[in-house]
């Protein structure tokens, strides 16, 4: 067991709750103590949902452990079915209740209820939230479609051409507490509609158990989020011969590849409009003169597997960034992320320790961090621009406006989210560079704060050398920065200043210098630049 201040994923029953809350006509009975009801806040506070999750907690207390907790479970199951009248029922237990081993799923199935019951066995001490969501979605669909799959195993499915209709697909994987899932679905619906493809079912987001019964009617499945839907897509492919897409349409090139793959799966002729990326401004900017400022920018990427892989491709192939670090907290996606890291000549960071990620960011010295809510905090402490690309996220990353990540418009949103922090960083550096110019007016307002130039100057000096711990030479004597050295260091762009300071101090120790002045800084620059 590990004690931590912050975690990237919750226990697997949170994933099950995400599936239940994303759907309609589905209820989740969770065997859990009163303290585990905190999960409601994730949906009402972060997702800003107008109603509570469809979850009934048994909320047992310490005094209940001396009696028959099984009867407590059955009572709550019966009350939930009578009150909410769901089309299907999920039954599971939280990490705490798992220790009691009441097996609430078996109890529910023995009650003779006249609705489908899906018993969830989610190992809380070896698996995490995304796995729990994936397993819940898989078990729910398998339980509902099992009889249909047995009946249709020998029946050949007619193609959409034979039936004389437009092809139709399922969009699988979007859920609540996913990163921009609501807007991604709208964008993909729009793109597919423009390409003559209809939507059969969107699940789990907005679907009901009766909608899931129509999944086999699709000609193909679109796997939007592999962490959630890949295992389900594999099962549908085995049992109903329904192919599914492997490319996630995040980025201009990925969207083009996605459409080409889907056209091929559906047996459609590839349209010339697929290669037409004029609907996104990202390719245009990448060809413009202004984009030269972005070329070669060092970027560190961390988050869930799907968004990390997409971000690495966009950064490397579409914006001309240099990826200097890549990693994920998703153990299920570790193999794919490692393969992508190898192609970039890197070693992937697979961890759920945010402090380890922060240390890796320090070592890589990037100019931009693409990560989760936690990397935003880490980057702020390190003075590095950051854009959030993945869950876990805070409420500010669930905008009320239309802000997808997928498709053509998603590429525009990504362009804005990634480039603006770098442009604001350039502005801050220019203000600092020309601060001592006689034409510079120090009192003007800027985006850096209501105190104008004075705030920025104070910020620059306070984040300079004085607050950093003294570095000791091998002989045990400290290395001091002179005022001249500090002045020269302040002229260096803030996004590489930390690396320059470390290299200069390393050079000073090797050269036996006790003080670092402007000349030492220039000597160090020449030494490491050679």
Curated annotation (Swiss-Prot):
Annotated family: Belongs to the ChlB/BchB/BchZ family.
Composition bias, Polar residues: 458-473
Cofactor detail note: Binds 1 [4Fe-4S] cluster per heterodimer. The cluster is bound at the heterodimer interface by residues from both subunits.
Alphabetized SUPFAM superfamilies for the sequence: Helical backbone' metal receptor
Binding, substrate: 425-426
Keyword Nucleotide-binding assigned: yes
Pfam families, alphabetized: Oxidored_nitro, PCP_red
Reaction equation(s) it catalyzes: chlorophyllide a + oxidized 2[4Fe-4S]-[ferredoxin] + 2 ADP + 2 phosphate = protochlorophyllide a + reduced 2[4Fe-4S]-[ferredoxin] + 2 ATP + 2 H2O
Keywords in alphabetical order: 4Fe-4S, ATP-binding, Chlorophyll biosynthesis, Iron, Iron-sulfur, Metal-binding, Nucleotide-binding, Oxidoreductase, Photosynthesis
Protein name: Light-independent protochlorophyllide reductase subunit B
Classification via NCBIfam families: DPOR_BchB, PRK02910.1-4
């Amino acid at each position: 067991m590990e004690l931590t201040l912050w975690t990237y994923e919750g226990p697997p029953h949170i994933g099950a709750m995400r599936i239940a809350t994303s759907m309609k006509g589905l209820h989740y009975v969770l065997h859990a103590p009163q303290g585990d009801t905190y999960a409601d806040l994730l949906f009402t506070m972060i997702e800003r949902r107008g109603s509570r999750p469809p979850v009934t907690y048994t909320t047992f207390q310490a005094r209940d452990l001396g009696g028959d907790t099984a009867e407590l479970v059955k009572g709550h199951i019966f009350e939930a079915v009578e009150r909410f009248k769901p089309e299907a029922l999920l039954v599971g237990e939280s990490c705490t209740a798992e220790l009691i081993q009441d097996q609430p799923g078996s109890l529910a199935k023995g009650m003779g209820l006249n609705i489908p019951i899906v018993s969830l066995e989610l190992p809380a001490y070896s698996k995490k939230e995304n796995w729990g969501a994936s397993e819940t979605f898989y078990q729910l669909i398998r339980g509902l479609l099992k009889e249909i799959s047995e009946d249709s195993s020998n029946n050949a499915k007619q193609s959409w051409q034979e039936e004389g209709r437009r092809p139709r697909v399922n969009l699988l994987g979007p859920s609540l507490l996913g990163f921009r899932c609501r807007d991604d679905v709208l964008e993909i619906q729009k793109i597919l509609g423009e390409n003559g493809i209809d939507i059969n079912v969107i699940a789990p987001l907005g679907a009901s158990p009766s909608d899931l019964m129509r999944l086999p009617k699709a000609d193909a499945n679109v796997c939007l989020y592999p962490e959630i839907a890949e295992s389900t897509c594999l099962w549908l492919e085995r049992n109903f011969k329904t192919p599914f897409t492997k490319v996630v349409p995040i980025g201009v090139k990925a969207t083009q590849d996605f459409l080409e793959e889907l056209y091929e799966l559906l047996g459609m002729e590839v349209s010339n409009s697929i290669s037409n990326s004029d609907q996104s401004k990202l390719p245009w900017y990448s060809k413009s003169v202004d984009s030269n400022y972005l070329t070669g920018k060092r970027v560190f990427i961390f988050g869930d597997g799907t968004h990390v892989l997409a971000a690495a491709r966009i950064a490397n192939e579409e914006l001309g960034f240099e990826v200097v670090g890549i990693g994920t907290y998703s153990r299920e996606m570790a193999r794919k992320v490692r393969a992508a890291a190898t192609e970039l000549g890197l070693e992937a960071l697979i961890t759920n320790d945010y402090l380890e990620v922060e240390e890796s960011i320090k070592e890589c010295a990037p100019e931009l961090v693409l990560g989760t809510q936690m990397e935003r905090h880490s980057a702020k402490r390190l003075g590095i621009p950051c854009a959030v690309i993945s869950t876990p996220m805070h409420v500010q990353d669930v905008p009320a406006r239309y802000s997808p990540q997928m498709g053509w418009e998603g590429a525009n949103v990504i362009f804005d989210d990634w480039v603006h922090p770098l442009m604001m960083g350039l502005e801050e550096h220019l203000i600092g560079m020309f601060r001592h110019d006689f034409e510079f007016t120090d009192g003007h307002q800027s985006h850096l704060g209501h105190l104008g130039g004075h705030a920025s100057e104070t910020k620059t000096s306070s984040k300079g050398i004085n607050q950093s711990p003294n570095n000791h030479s091998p002989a045990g004597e400290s290395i001091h920065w002179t005022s001249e050295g500090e002045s020269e260091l302040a002229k260096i762009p803030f996004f590489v200043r930390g690396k320059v300071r470390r290299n200069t101090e390393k050079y000073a120790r090797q050269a036996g210098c006790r003080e670092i002045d402007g000349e030492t800084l220039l000597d160090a620059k020449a030494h490491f630049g050679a």
